[in-house]
Regions:
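Cofactor-pocket helix-loop regions in the catalytic cores of large enzyme subunits
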Residues: 1-128, 134, 155-173
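Surface-exposed loop and adjacent secondary-structure segments within mature catalytic domains
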Residues: 6, 128, 135-151
Length: 173
């Protein structure tokens, strides 16, 4: 009732919708492609991949109208910032990786990374899974989701902690 846009898609069609939004963003000239290429690789591959995700085709897959898809893409492009939230259920599907990739693609295409009020935000639960990763409470991680097996990551943490890097073991444990 309070949403400006509500896309009531059919179950399992998130990836198609997100790809159609990306298709519109790119094909309607709503993306600063030079900016995307400064921060990521593979834009030409993405464009080629998205050819199959026209609003007309995806409308039939998702249950949305073609106009809803186009309007949503333009709204995203024109917004000062876009912040996407998803919860653990989004990650518990056979398409979880693709769902996350497509959300991240939308943030990248609209320059909504590393800006105040913008970006993708996973709100995981389950005994504070996200918090455990960020503070290094898992055996293979250091704070900031740095890997113990990565020498550069160990060096960064050792420098911050003021200890010799050899004090941080390179194997989980």
């Amino acid at each position: 009732e309070i949403a400006d846009i509500h896309l009531q898609i059919w179950p399992g069609t998130d990836v198609a919708l997100n790809n159609a939004l990306a298709y519109v963003l790119l094909n309607d000239g709503l993306v600063d492609e030079a900016n995307v290429e400064r921060h990521a690789s593979g834009l030409s591959d993405l464009k080629e991949f998205l050819i199959e995700y026209t609003p007309a085709k995806v409308a039939k897959i998702t249950g949305c109208t073609e106009d809803q898809i186009i309007k949503t893409a333009h709204t995203i492009a024109e917004a000062k910032a876009m912040l996407t939230f998803w919860f653990q259920g989004y990650n518990h599907s056979t398409q979880a990786v693709f769902k996350n990739n497509t959300l991240h693609n939308l943030s990248l295409l609209t320059d909504n990374f590393c800006r105040v009020g913008a970006g993708p935000l996973s709100l995981t639960g389950e005994a504070n899974a996200l918090g455990n990763r960020w503070v290094g409470a898992l055996s293979h991680l250091l704070p900031g989701v740095r890997q113990v097996a990565n020498y550069q990551h160990r060096t960064e943490v050792a420098d911050y902690w003021g200890v010799p890097v050899v004090q941080i073991q390179p194997v989980p444990g």
